[in-house]
């Protein structure tokens, strides 16, 4: 998880936390630095991918990516990254509503959306427009295709709310591990 402070004239600064997934930039520096062409951007949809057969694992793409979206696979000796679940989103055997990346379909709070930002009438374009979506780190001039939304207003009555206090396990019937954890945490 990365954390960045984002400044906004209307709301001031706030922290943005996001996973290390590829933003599939329009001007992807990871693509231009790749000496073998293994990092490439698909012309038909703009998805940035890595060809495992031609990647030499030099890690230049990792150094070039300002978002930290590249990972080196020690076992395979190559770079890996988010593929936007390209095999899933274009799978004709899946119903249309299931053709979304795994990160979108499995997000437990529904914080992720997917769609065509090039279509101003799409649900995702409407969401980005209505909530004031923005590019992450625009000063990098990578033009990421993923947009981030400002935090929703806090719900009334939730200010100052904390997680419930955790009570240490002290019951003699507790397992060995629970007693060890309790002893370790209370030290």
Which positions does each model-derived feature cover?
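Non-ligating segments of multi-cofactor redox enzymes
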Residues: 1-187
């Amino acid at each position: 998880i990365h954390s960045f402070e984002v400044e906004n004239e209307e709301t001031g600064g706030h922290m943005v936390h996001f996973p290390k997934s590829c933003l599939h930039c329009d001007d992807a520096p990871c693509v231009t630095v790749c000496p073998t062409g293994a990092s490439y951007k698909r012309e038909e949809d703009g998805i940035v991918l890595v060809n495992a057969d031609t990647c030499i694992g030099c890690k230049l793409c990792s150094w070039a990516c300002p978002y930290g979206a590249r990972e080196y696979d020690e076992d395979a000796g190559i770079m890996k990254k988010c593929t936007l679940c390209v095999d899933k989103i274009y799978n004709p055997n899946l119903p249309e509503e299931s053709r979304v990346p795994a990160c979108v379909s499995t997000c437990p709070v529904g914080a992720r959306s997917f769609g065509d930002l090039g279509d101003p009438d799409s649900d995702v374009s409407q969401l980005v427009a209505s909530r004031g979506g923005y590019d992450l780190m625009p000063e990098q001039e990578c033009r990421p295709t993923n947009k981030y939304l400002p935090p929703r207003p806090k719900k009334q009555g939730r200010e100052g709310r904390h997680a419930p206090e955790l009570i240490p396990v002290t019951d003699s019937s507790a397992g060995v591990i629970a007693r060890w954890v309790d002893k370790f945490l209370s030290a």
